[in-house]
């Protein structure tokens, strides 16, 4: 629980499961300095919490994910104390992602920050008995750039969910679109989620600007983040007729609105050398929605989407190609076919049961 909520650390019982709700510093929706300090203090807070609340508990398996990479000492403490096995779910490769975006330098005085976090990253890999990556491209990147990692401990263990059926009537879809002024007679492309540096917002703006002549499509951008202000300035200045920007919505309204759209959008900055694999993909697939991904060339999310025949991909530097794919996806029959493929692919590859079986096979 972040400090801003003013809730003390507490241990709760949820149907027999003991959950420790630690009070930590503010990490989300704050400035970089506060976020950095809060992230650095995480492992000491976790370690103290484990010692205080779980001193008599013996753990057999520790599951942990990135971000953040600053839990190494807490994981190592349990591993040594309880002789526990450790499994890292590698959802983000830091600090290289920050280097790619120019946020951290590898040379000069500023390289000290990089060296600190790189050491943390190496230590996290070292204490991990197994490493589950989001995709094959992640495995290739990790092995190529970390000679100390043995390929026998690394495998694909992708993001996953427990799929639910999305049941929204045509009346509800029409009602929610009318409530927020979203056209009911156009193909609506939605981006929902973080609006930060990793998303390459400048390219998103370029796509909206260059697609204004398409009378069949409409862009709905819903989210928050460090780049929201840049988008807001663009919308206030240009007032694009083919797009809408929304910040925060009531949870139920967002769920209905998002699932009343036609195509899910994924954006990644073209400068990335690490193969990101955004979890946003899964919510689109759950809604039987085709996906248009515009990313760097190093991620394999585009290959997964196109091989599964549930969407299209283009590089996040080619607005003309992006807009040609937008035109293709204005075909209702194509969207219906791809949407069905998306849901099927999700159920066959990205369920919580699949992830469980990948992890637990090591401990049977």
Task: State each model region's role.
Residues 6-10, 167-182:
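A short helix/loop element that forms part of the nucleotide-sugar donor recognition site in Leloir-type
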Residues 27-34, 57, 82-119, 164:
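Acceptor-binding helix/loop patch of EC 2.4 sugar-transfer enzymes
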Residues 183-199, 205-208:
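Conserved donor-binding/catalytic core segment of Leloir-type glycosyltransferases
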Residues 73, 77-81, 111-133:
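Membrane-proximal helix-turn-helix segments that form the acceptor-binding/catalytic region
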